Amino acid sequence: MIKSSAKHNDFGLTPDLTPLLDIIFIVMVFLLLTASVRLESLEVALPTTDSPVVNEVNKESITVNILATEPYWAIDGKPYLDWHNFSLALLESVQVDKRPVVIAADQGAEVQQLVKLLSFLQENGIQATQLLTEPSHS
């Protein structure tokens, strides 16, 4: 007996998804390329006060200085060569003296140094009561 081989139709009723996957991949690549847009920033002026009279720094406070050049850190006018020594000294000063912290940053100091200090103060539950500014000369 002669048998004919039956053709198996694998396609059936299921659609071919390859073109759909190609389109999804192309759209995904397009979105990834357009999502990496460079952030634009505006030039900003440093804050000043409008008040001609600036309150004197409370002598009963710990003054933390952020300097423009190395060493970047100082406590009550005493500079520290690195962040580790400064942070240990600041923690000790705050725990021993229980005085409020005043931050005095040099106008030419990097913002990154201020952000680092504020992050450290927040992590250790230290509240800075004042940020020193200078009066505007307009």
From Swiss-Prot:
Residues 1-16 are cytoplasmic. It is found in: Cell inner membrane. One of its GO terms (cellular component) is plasma membrane. InterPro entries: ExbD. It comes from the Bacteria. The chain crosses the membrane at residues 17-37. Residues 38-138 are periplasmic. It is a single-pass type II membrane protein. One of its GO terms (biological process) is protein transport. One of its GO terms (molecular function) is transmembrane transporter activity. Keywords: Cell inner membrane, Cell membrane, Membrane, Protein transport, Transmembrane, Transmembrane helix, Transport. Belongs to the ExbD/TolR family. Involved in the TonB-dependent energy-dependent transport of various receptor-bound substrates. PANTHER family: BIOPOLYMER TRANSPORT PROTEIN EXBD1 (PTHR30558:SF15), EXBD MEMBRANE COMPONENT OF PMF-DRIVEN MACROMOLECULE IMPORT SYSTEM (PTHR30558). The accessory proteins ExbB and ExbD seem to form a complex with TonB. This is Biopolymer transport protein exbD1. It comes from Vibrio cholerae serotype O1 (strain ATCC 39315 / El Tor Inaba N16961). The lineage of its organism: Bacteria, Pseudomonadati, Pseudomonadota, Gammaproteobacteria, Vibrionales.
